[in-house]
UniProtKB/Swiss-Prot annotation:
GO biological process, one term: proteolysis
Official protein name in the record: Lipoprotein signal peptidase
Family to which this protein belongs: Belongs to the peptidase A8 family.
Keywords: Aspartyl protease, Cell membrane, Hydrolase, Membrane, Protease, Transmembrane, Transmembrane helix
Enzyme type, top EC level: hydrolase
Compartment(s) where it occurs, according to its Swiss-Prot or TrEMBL record: Cell membrane
Catalytic residues (positions): 115, 131
Gene from which this protein is expressed: lspA
InterPro entries reported in the protein's UniProt record: Peptidase_A8
Lineage of the organism: Bacteria, Bacillati, Bacillota, Bacilli, Lactobacillales
GO CC, one annotated term: plasma membrane
Disulfide bonds: none
Enzyme nomenclature, EC number: 3.4.23.36
Catalyzed chemical reaction(s): Release of signal peptides from bacterial membrane prolipoproteins. Hydrolyzes -Xaa-Yaa-Zaa-|-(S,diacylglyceryl)Cys-, in which Xaa is hydrophobic (preferably Leu), and Yaa (Ala or Ser) and Zaa (Gly or Ala) have small, neutral side chains
């Protein structure tokens, strides 16, 4: 049952990411800024051919290799830890897998990643839902591993 819940959750997360990108591409012109939540969040449709902060632009082969490695390692640990009672560890791996798949789908389908979320209150890169999954997933993974080590596991 746990496998089904995790698989369905991952599919829903990837679907949410892809749906958000679909709406941005359909309804916002490239480079246009649309106020979403005033003074908090704007939507800006960008095509990112690089990684976070557009580093390593146009290196699709590199991102493909890195994505396969990261997804493979995350899947391996998710399967290995499937019976664990550590919710945070499973959640972190699920978010990392979902975020990686969301951006990987873009790279395969479009040749770039659709970014759109712009935080108006801070000078920060424009990102997408999958990037959020990855960031939160990595943060949760660090916390989960730190707690495991602290508990002597």
């Amino acid at each position: 049952m746990r496998k089904i819940v995790l698989a369905v959750t991952a599919l829903l997360l990837v679907a949410l990411d892809q749906l958000s990108k679909f709406f941005v591409v359909k309804y916002i012109r490239l480079g246009t800024i649309v106020e979403f939540i005033p003074n908090l969040v704007s939507l800006t449709y960008l095509r990112n051919t690089g990684a976070a902060f557009s580093i390593l632009e146009n290196q699709q082969w590199l991102f493909t290799v890195i994505t396969f490695i990261v997804l493979g390692v995350a899947f391996y640990y998710l399967i290995k830890q499937m019976q664990t009672q550590n919710f945070w560890l499973l959640a972190s791996l699920l978010l990392i897998i979902s975020g990686g798949l969301g951006n990987f789908i873009d790279r395969l389908r479009l040749g770039y990643v659709v970014d759109m979320i712009h935080l108006d209150f801070v000078d920060f890169a424009i990102f997408n839902v999958a990037d959020s999954y990855l960031s939160v997933g990595v943060a949760l993974l660090i916390i989960a591993l730190w707690k495991e080590e602290k508990n002597g596991n």
